[in-house]
Regions:
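General structural signal for secondary-structure boundaries
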Residues: 1-6, 53-54, 98, 138, ...
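Eukaryote-specific detector of the first structured module of a protein
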Residues: 2-60, 70
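EF-hand and EF-hand-like Ca2+-sensor regions
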Residues: 61-193
């Protein structure tokens, strides 16, 4: 159940987009994302130029997401609307065929997770990313998920590069198989109620 397609999409909503935790996606969530991404990308500082870029990216992201998913045009995207948009625009598709808003967010997410900016998400960065969303009493649980996620090429390279991250993220959203390795992209998942 934790790795079902439905739960994976709910996970994305709760932990990546619904920043104000009100159960709906709206413009405020993306304004908050601009602030958060600026601070995370800048390692605690708040450069105005980086914020201006992030603010524009997140405003564009919200506008495109609202166009794709706000079916009733109320200025909010419900979980059901988001799921329907993902089914329509992402399911069964590769990263290259995702809407621009989704591709932009995926690329920004990679830069956020790649803490040391070496172009790879290694196990240490993966651990940091996982614990930022959920509690774990055993680091082995996280490491096991990372090992299930990585293929031989990832392990040989010392981590997951941007192209592979894009591929995995696309599979996380588009592949209904609960056993695909991409299910572990964000660590051991919890069931979202």
């Amino acid at each position: 159940m934790a790795y079902s397609w439905d739960n994976r999409v709910m996970y994305i909503i709760r932990y990546f987009y619904d920043i104000d935790n009100n159960g709906l996606l709206d413009k405020n969530d993306f304004e908050c994302l601009a602030v958060r991404n600026t601070i995370v990308e800048s390692r605690g500082t708040f450069p105005e130029d980086v914020f201006a870029t992030n603010k524009k990216v997140m405003a564009d992201l919200w506008n495109e997401l609202a166009e794709l998913a706000d079916f009733n045009k109320d200025g909010e995207v419900s979980a059901d609307e988001f799921k329907q948009a993902v089914k329509t625009h992402c399911q069964g598709k590769s990263y290259a065929n995702f809407p621009t808003a989704f591709r932009t967010f995926i690329d920004k997410q990679f830069r956020t997770v790649d803490v040391n900016a070496d172009g790879f998400v290694g196990v240490e960065e993966y651990r940091l990313d996982c614990i930022s969303r959920a509690g774990f009493s055993d680091v082995g649980e996280i490491d096991d998920a990372y090992n299930k996620l990585c293929n031989d090429a990832d392990k040989k390279a010392g981590g997951i590069n941007l192209a592979r991250y894009q591929e995995l993220y696309a599979q996380f959203l588009s592949n209904p198989d609960e056993k695909c390795s991409a299910c572990y992209l964000f660590g051991p998942l919890k069931v979202i109620e």
